[in-house]
A protein has these predicted regions:
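SDR active-site strand-loop-helix element
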Residues: 8, 34, 72-73, 109-115, ...
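Conserved Rossmann-fold NAD(P)-dependent oxidoreductase catalytic core, especially the SDR/UDP-sugar
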Residues: 80-84, 88-133, 138-147
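NAD(P)H-binding glycine-rich loop region in Rossmannoid oxidoreductase-like domains
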Residues: 5, 40, 47-96, 100-103
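Residues at the starts of beta-strands that form the adenosine-phosphate
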Residues: 4, 28-30, 47, 107-108, ...
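Oxidoreductase cofactor-interface core, primarily capturing Rossmann-like NAD(P)-dependent enzymes
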Residues: 24-27, 44, 119-223
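N-terminal Rossmann NAD(P)H-binding glycine-rich loop of SDR-like oxidoreductase domains
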Residues: 3-25
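Short, polar loop motifs at secondary-structure junctions
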Residues: 33-40
């Protein structure tokens, strides 16, 4: 069955991997990327549409015929500049995406959240992520899949010095993180993307939450199709 995927946040680290994973899947005949700037990628299945979050209704044409919506939006407090702007990117925009997707007839949404997401958390970041999860679930899509990764590894287009330092530490400690600590291991962005696409293809209904260790299991193992398509490991995949 031919499927159309829409990716919001496709210019980011995880989103970029999601786009590449989708393009090599035979089940997806159309891959639409909605963002504020275009991707520098050419592919016969790839379509792109610029979105103005102040006037999102002007971009609803991009969602026509959508089956699966992948939301990979996210920022940092440093980049956002304020708590209000952070909530806008990490909560308001994903919820708006889900609403537009439902109106367009989307069957499922797959969204990147974060480890520790909790609407009752005292930590602003975790609380915002938890509130976003609750709001997404309340929209009532046939299926909602929420992914809660730990520190995400990969080459970003912008420098995040705090994350860079944490990455060095997490890589050094990775071999020591066993037992209960294993669930906190940093995870390559490619693993998250691969897990999201595989879960989408399974087409399970309802609301599902995937913690970091489960994401790693689903996204780590390459299938014969992955190998033939050339979506193999990156340097960070061995973490």
């Amino acid at each position: 069955m031919e499927r159309k995927a829409v990716v919001v946040g496709g210019t980011g680290l995880v989103g970029g991997y999601v786009v590449r994973e989708l393009l090599v899947q035979k089940e997806y005949t159309r891959v639409m990327v909605m963002g504020r700037r275009p991707l520098d990628i050419k592919h016969p299945k790839l379509e792109q549409a610029l979105i103005d979050w102040e006037q999102p209704q002007k971009s609803t044409f991009a969602l026509e015929g959508v089956d699966d919506v992948f939301c990979c939006l996210g920022t940092t407090m440093k980049k956002a500049g304020s708590k209000e702007r952070f909530r806008q990117v990490d909560l308001d925009y994903p919820v708006l995406t889900a609403q537009l997707g439902k109106e367009a007839g989307a069957v499922q949404m797959l969204a990147v959240s974060a480890m520790g997401a909790d609407p009752d958390s005292r930590v602003f970041y975790n609380r915002t992520k938890g509130e976003a999860e609750e709001a997404l679930a309340a929209i009532g899509l046939p299926a909602l899949h929420l992914f809660r990764p730990s520190l995400i590894l990969g080459a970003r287009s912008e420098r995040r010095f705090g994350e860079a330092a944490a990455t060095v530490v997490m890589k050094a400690l990775d071999g020591l993180m066993t037992g209960r600590l294993a669930s906190y291991r940093a995870i390559p962005a490619s693993f998250i993307a691969r897990a999201m696409v595989r879960i989408a293809l399974a087409q399970a209904s309802g609301v599902h939450i995937y913690p970091n260790d489960i994401i790693r299991v689903i996204g780590a193992e390459l299938t014969s199709d992955d190998k033939e398509a050339g979506t193999g490991t990156t340097p960070d995949d061995n973490v």
